[in-house]
Amino acid sequence: CIHNGFGLHTFKEELTGPEYAGRFIKQVMDLGIEYKLHTMVMDISSDKIVTAMNREEGLFEIQAGAVILAMGCRERSRGALNIPGYRPAGIYSAGTAQRLVNMEGYMPGREVVILGSGDIGLIMARRMTLEGAKVKVVAELMPYSGGLKRNIVQCLNDYDIPLKLSHTVVDIKGKERVEGITLAEVDGKG
């Protein structure tokens, strides 16, 4: 995330996403903490032996004094969301869309519908708009937004992006590429 708004609690100043991450990277470097990127943990034994692997070292073990599980998050797939229809190109998770725009410099679409009004969905609506996309709607299954009020104002209201609460995607049209979606209102009873 390249927008600002990070660091207020931790560093007592407003930072962009890269600046915020940079502060933590500097702390790790200053403290001499060993770290391994692109590494997968295969096993953690009861006596704290961590078996891991990566391309550089292959399979290896680390004897740990303590183990802290900080595994990040994994986005739910479209299948886990029970959205019917084909799986055409042009449908992305929020994390993939963020990576494409922020790191790869690639716009995933010109006309966008965002499902989910948590802070990531709201911020991506603004980001896609700033990059030239037309965000047609942000749809939210719940009768309220999961995002901060300030993000609703700064990311949707300031850009005239509509928010449809109690709505979800019930169909995806298109076989090769997404051609459209169908939204439906939900009533809380399923």
Stretch-by-stretch model annotation:
Residues H3, L8, K12, R78-A80, ...:
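Generic secondary-structure boundary/loop-capping signal
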Residues C1-R23, Q27, P108-Q154, P162-K164, ...:
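Beta1-alpha1 glycine-rich phosphate/pyrophosphate-binding loop at the start
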Residues I2-N4, E14, L69, R76, ...:
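Generic detector of intrinsically disordered, low-complexity, polar/charged segments
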Residues Y20-E111, V186-G190:
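FAD-binding core/adjacent interface of flavoenzyme oxidoreductases
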Residues V28-N54, T129-G190:
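A Rossmann-like FAD-binding core segment of flavoenzymes
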